[in-house]
């Protein structure tokens, strides 16, 4: 979780065996205490909207909806892959963000530069390594989580020009979500209400995929 105030940021991260749902609210209260603020002082919210873990996305969104219930403060829905790519600040040229999607696949998107909100180079989707290797530009930097490392290894065998960045850059950074969210909220029309938000899974849950015959969301 992170809080932006002026030009500074306060961020709390954790790696705990406890369920995400048990850690999130206490961390939010700790964050506000560190900044000597109350929840009522917060002008707007940003959330990493997906793709990602079904459970993680649901917990995060349910928590935000609880905080914003009956509230008119704006919410920014930040694409998760854009936030991950933003961690490669200082890189020049295209940067692709990869997250483990299991089944030998990754969620991926490619951006013209770190900090871009729109995946103009390659739109977010679910890829096998061979398909992704055929579509990434030359010398693309790769931001990846631990689970995507096997895919990145195969990618680099197919495309030696690709540049995997340190795995530490692929860890979730709430401050990146907050900074992109603030940019979204600078355009009032882009702000969302709590009841209009839905997780961006990309890959449909198995039951829905079977019912619709479509494994991916539009």
Where does each model-flagged region fall?
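Flexible, glycine/charged-enriched surface loops at secondary-structure junctions
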Residues: 191-195
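Surface "functional belts" at beta-alpha junctions
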Residues: 9, 13, 19, 74-172, ...
């Amino acid at each position: 979780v992170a809080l932006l105030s002026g030009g500074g940021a306060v961020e709390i991260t954790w790696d705990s065996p406890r369920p995400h749902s048990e850690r999130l609210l206490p961390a939010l209260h700790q964050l506000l205490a560190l900044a000597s603020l109350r929840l009522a002082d917060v002008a707007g919210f940003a959330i990493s909207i997906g793709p990602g873990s079904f459970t993680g996305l649901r917990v995060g969104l349910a928590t935000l909806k609880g905080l914003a219930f009956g509230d008119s403060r704006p919410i920014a829905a930040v694409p998760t892959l854009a936030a991950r790519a933003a961690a490669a600040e200082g890189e020049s040229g295209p940067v692709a963000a990869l997250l483990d999607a299991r089944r030998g696949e990754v969620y991926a998107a490619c951006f013209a530069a770190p900090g871009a909100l729109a995946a103009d180079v390659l739109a977010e989707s679910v890829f096998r390594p061979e398909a992704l290797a055929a579509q990434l530009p030359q010398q693309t930097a790769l931001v990846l989580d631990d689970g995507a490392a096997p895919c990145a290894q195969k990618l680099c065998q197919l495309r030696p020009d690709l540049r995997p960045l340190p795995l530490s850059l692929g860890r979730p950074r709430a401050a990146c979500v907050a900074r992109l969210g603030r940019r979204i909220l600078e355009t009032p029309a882009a702000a969302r209400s709590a009841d209009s938000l839905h997780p961006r899974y990309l890959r449909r849950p198995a039951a829905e995929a079977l019912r619709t015959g479509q494994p991916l969301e539009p």
